[in-house]
Regions:
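Short, hinge-like loop/turn segments at secondary-structure boundaries
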Residues: 40-42, 82, 116-117
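Single conserved hydrophobic/aromatic residue that forms the stacking wall/gate
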Residues: 1-8, 12
Length: 198
């Protein structure tokens, strides 16, 4: 029904205003049969998204879909995994226009500042994820292989020193210290930590 209603809207739009641009959009979620509330981060809506994205490409129109969606009431583990499992299909499906990519909580009823910052941080990773594998001369690091002998490590090589700053995506919000350091600094959890970094 998503595709037929979108197609019907497109036909109607072409009759009313021929040549006007169109965007194919979808919003799919599963539902809790216990409460009737929408649920997010489940596989079924991701499959709907993938199918609609393919249909939009077949029709030659841009595709719009949702982003970092969650039913959680706070920026907690549930918010993190549901948002991850909704933004990844959105990005991997080739969505052209993303709604609700950051800060969306409780099924869209609430916007949350901490979640907005956490989601925005994760969104900076997406280009690195979808741009594929870098096979450039620099990325292959053949000079580092030649410079570093058997039994040695690459940390001190000229190539590592020249590339370590941007070789890997780094979160601006995550804490990558040891447990002891984290504990000595007050054991601050992510939703509180982002308040000081945002």
């Amino acid at each position: 029904t998503l595709s037929s209603s979108s197609a019907a809207s497109d036909v109607y739009k072409r009759q009313v205003n021929p040549g006007a641009p169109v965007i194919f959009g979808s919003f799919a979620s599963s539902m809790s049969m216990q409460t009737g509330a929408p649920t997010f981060g489940t596989p079924e809506p991701a499959k709907v998204l993938y199918g609609c994205a393919k249909l939009a490409r077949r029709l030659g129109v841009p595709f719009r879909s949702g982003g970092s969606l969650t039913g959680s009431k706070t920026a907690d583990a549930q918010a993190a995994y549901e948002s991850t499992h909704t933004i990844l299909p959105t990005i991997m499906g080739g969505t052209n226009f993303v709604l609700h990519s950051a800060g969306w909580m409780e099924g869209g009823l609430v916007a949350d500042y901490a979640k907005l910052l956490l989601d925005a941080d994760q969104l900076t990773m997406m280009p690195k994820l979808v741009n594929g594998i870098d096979l450039s001369e620099n990325a292959q690091a053949m000079d580092a292989l030649r410079e570093t002998g058997p039994g040695q490590h690459f940390l001190g090589s000229a190539h590592t020193q020249a590339n370590f700053e941007d070789a890997f995506w780094r979160s601006q919000m995550a804490d990558n210290t040891t447990f002891e350091q984290w504990s000595s600094e007050g054991s601050v959890e992510s939703s509180a930590r982002v308040q000081t970094r945002g």
